[in-house]
């Protein structure tokens, strides 16, 4: 497919290291096959130059709906190995946080829908994620109580 570079604009993915390989239309969802690859960095442990090792099993990253169907990105991340200290490292992207599989844009959409007072099961169904993910995002919010005034009517039970 010659137009795969337009997918980054369509999905608003700004990471230049993600290369899209193919799009598969399943019966229930769309799968975008991509790989994350860049030059080997220096080792964060010993400082020597790491080498490209292989790719991880694809991460199944849920993404926003496209053309009315749930979309997920099957992202193969490059692994790097330091031959000096034998440590391994996985390529990182701005699409998702380190050691996470829910993209930042989905987390923003969850927060937006929680503010709109949509039920958690509806949010999970609309974004093709689990209800527990929505609950975890709700627990990330910090609610402040305003104790600067008292209510007009107060009652005590004796």
Regions found by a protein language model. Give the residues of each.
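Short, positively charged, Gly/Tyr-enriched micro-motifs
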Residues: 60-158
